[in-house]
A protein has these predicted regions:
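Phosphate-binding site recognition
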Residues: 1-232, 236
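A cross-kingdom feature that marks ATP-driven nucleic-acid transaction machinery
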Residues: 201-336
């Protein structure tokens, strides 16, 4: 038996969960049923099965969190859909969808996977992308969604420390909302310099989902353009900003590429807690003892200044990793 949108019983008849607990506990060993339930509201599904105060706590034999396509699969999809694709097209698919099958399928069923076609398909009248972020998250947040949306909008725009976010929201205290966005909703994560201690105050917040990040940065921020159906104007803004925005996402792409290679024991960025100085885009510690990679990420290799990265790595080595041997690289579009 398969039950989809299992969390909806909260809105219909919450006692269903207690009834199911009694039936399951009584007949589980006697029956030959494989019961599968699924749901799209992360926080409620977590509550149902992982909150020890809920009747179905501990009853799930297996919990599967559906993941996005990995980078190898995205490349295969690109080759099948657009054999002449460029790495910039691949980066755009990653930037806009994060590999979420639903969004990738929408693109593949309707267009050729190129930057311009993807932007035109997303930003048009009656596009399913226009309200997708709102529809996904209002169900999670409920009627008090406004503050959460303001926080996510700030983070998507590069305001990523708690004091900066609170200042952007008029000095509103947001500690509780930040905690829930991390622990209950699984939407943002804390980023600390690599090897920083858990209690370190050098924290930046980041939206995990590529599409949600993109949606807040453009669809939510430029809602006024959508309301007057100025889709041409919004397309122009996205295209003009694409080199800068995709450059940020290229760093995320390479971190994922490092992770999927299974050759590293820790992957992150590094910066000094005070002043964000000597920042290194990617620091990856290899499985081999005292071996690491330090990478500067640039869309174009011609913009790379090796002497700057060398100075930053020496600073990191002296401060944190004195015994490490570093491989210094520049990663660009051509390395995807």
């Amino acid at each position: 038996m398969v039950i989809d949108e299992f969390q909806e019983f909260y809105n219909i008849n919450e006692s269903v969960y207690s009834d199911m607990q009694n039936i399951w506990d009584t007949y589980r060993k006697k029956s030959k049923m494989n019961l599968i339930v699924s749901g799209s509201v992360y926080s409620l599904m977590q509550k149902i099965f992982q909150n020890n105060k809920e009747p179905l706590f501990g009853r799930a034999d297996n919990i599967i969190k559906l993941s996005a396509f990995d980078l190898t699969t995205l490349k295969e999809i690109m080759r099948d859909n657009n054999p002449n694709y460029t790495n910039d097209d691949l980066l755009a698919l990653y930037t806009f969808t994060g590999g979420v099958p639903k969004y990738v399928e929408l693109f593949c069923d309707n267009i050729t996977l190129s930057i311009d076609e993807m932007i035109s398909f997303m930003v048009r009248d009656n596009s399913s992308f226009t309200d997708e972020g709102k529809n996904l998250l209002i169900e999670e947040f409920g009627k008090n969604y406004a503050t959460y949306f303001s926080i996510l909008s700030a983070i998507s725009g590069g305001i990523n420390t708690q004091p900066e976010i609170e200042a952007a929201l008029g000095d509103k205290s947001i500690g509780g909302q930040i905690k829930r966005l991390i622990e209950d909703y699984n939407i943002i994560v804390r980023q600390r310099p690599i090897l920083a201690k858990e209690g370190s105050q050098a924290v930046r917040y980041e939206i995990q989902d590529n599409f949600i990040r993109f949606w807040f940065n453009y669809f939510d921020r430029y809602r006024s353009l959508i309301e007057i159906k100025n889709f041409v104007g919004l397309q122009a803004i996205i295209k003009a900003n694409y080199p800068t925005y995709s450059g940020i996402m290229l760093e995320r792409y390479f971190k994922q590429q490092f992770a999927e290679s299974f050759q590293y024991r820790a992957i992150g960025s590094w910066w000094e807690p005070r002043g964000n100085q000597n920042e290194i885009d990617i620091v990856a510690l290899k499985l081999e003892k005292n071996q690491a990679v330090a990478a500067e990420v640039k869309r174009q290799k011609k913009n790379f200044k090796p002497e700057l990265l060398t100075a930053k790595v020496e600073h990191l080595r002296n401060k944190l990793l004195p015994k490490f041997q570093f491989e210094l690289v520049c990663l660009s579009l051509e390395d995807m």
